[in-house]
């Protein structure tokens, strides 16, 4: 049991320096970024998703392209997302962008996580009436059980990582 605990501890902290750096650059909570990485890839920088997502934060081509363009990075290609630093920078930038779309709400992070997971078009469909500004109503309006679970699991894991600085 002690060996399992030690291995999990090492894995849990394997990307801390990269996470802290990206969080600092994009003025984001490192505990949130780490929780997203935990949920997306369990800290595996070579993780591959079913529809082309890559790396720690499971970034897709479109998101990576937006990040590279916004940051003035030329000659960027999707394969570079296997690089942990590039992946976490792109993912953190993209999550910040998603959260920024929802500043008018009581909890922009909830809406941003839904957008990161399910896409902006779904969030726009779910955020009508009370759900437009009330995160509890918004979560209830989400039609995908996996997206609801995604948001709640990241919230719980974020609390576990709260001391990351």
Residue ranges and their predicted role:
Residues 32-34, 76, 103-114:
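Surface-exposed patches in mature extracellular/periplasmic domains of secreted proteins
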Residues 111-165:
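Catalytic and substrate-binding regions of cell-wall glycan-acting enzymes that process beta-1,4-linked
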